[in-house]
């Protein structure tokens, strides 16, 4: 797969539309609490400015119900971009209203226009042709630098790309980096290759598990999803989260791992609580002695030790999903220990998924990871072996 990249097309002096992913966390006062996604986009933006482009930026933010909602406005993003880029950012009043289209038309070389939240337009998530066409009419070049939404066939991600030929559209630096990194990890990892898969549900990770089994040497399963596997093995799991309908799938995955010689690790103990509550009575219990009616909300210390030991000989580690309810301090120890173990490893370490990226930031391990993906669902679909709609549009067709 050969990806068209921004550095390989002529953008000098052109009007460029860049789809970014500025969907950053904010507190109740509209202060940005983590601007990593904004900082990640700066390379592409600066490259365009250095090439005398006039730049139109677009992104979604949150899930507005339809139409303008102040709390979902991109104004705080414009302010942060102004600080980071040290230049004025023109804020559009809408996405494709007449005033916005006029601002885009009059944009001069070196100037930046930020469109309002793409999802204020109902047509964005429906991949509406009319909206795609209007967005495309604003610029001569289309750049997709939003890896985090490239698994979605939306107007500003996929629809718009149809109106540009392969010499006038490309992946931005961030997008190209993410795609190449995941491609390399999945298809050409340095062994032993170990995957850590966590999070609450098996259903969300099923395809990824099936795709990983033939590729990895070991797979570690933690988080709420581990209980479906433990129940499949005949363990009593109390009131822990379980997807009974997926027990046959869990058995199939374990069977598959066994037949491929892949070592599959499950928790041997848990931090069990009487209720899903930060204040609930909790204690450490082995899997064999789960108190009746209690629920496991984190892996226990023996599991953390076992998993860390399993990681000790890794050359490549791919981690997607926390080991427990890390948002509650009492149930964050397991995830924190695994985070430290991954960070201290000599392996190439790749963290995918919003929760896991957030977790390694909280544990202070962010700088010790080789690569932290900006995309949760997108990185998962790449692991599943899918071609993302936003990426497909940027692939250079190679003649046989």
From Swiss-Prot:
GO molecular function list: ADP binding; ATP binding; phosphoglycerate kinase activity
Cellular-component GO terms for this entry: cytosol
HAMAP family the UniProt entry points to: Phosphoglyc_kinase
Protein name: Phosphoglycerate kinase
Cited InterPro entries: Phosphoglycerate_kinase, Phosphoglycerate_kinase_CS, Phosphoglycerate_kinase_N, Phosphoglycerate_kinase_sf
Catalytic activity field: (2R)-3-phosphoglycerate + ATP = (2R)-3-phospho-glyceroyl phosphate + ADP
Main location: cytoplasm
Taxonomy of the source species: Bacteria, Pseudomonadati, Campylobacterota, Epsilonproteobacteria, Campylobacterales
ATP-binding is among the record's keywords: yes
The species this protein was found in: Aliarcobacter butzleri (strain RM4018) (Arcobacter butzleri)
Pathway(s) of this molecule: Carbohydrate degradation; glycolysis; pyruvate from D-glyceraldehyde 3-phosphate: step 2/5
Alphabetized UniProt keyword annotations: ATP-binding, Cytoplasm, Glycolysis, Kinase, Nucleotide-binding, Transferase
Subcellular location(s) per record: Cytoplasm
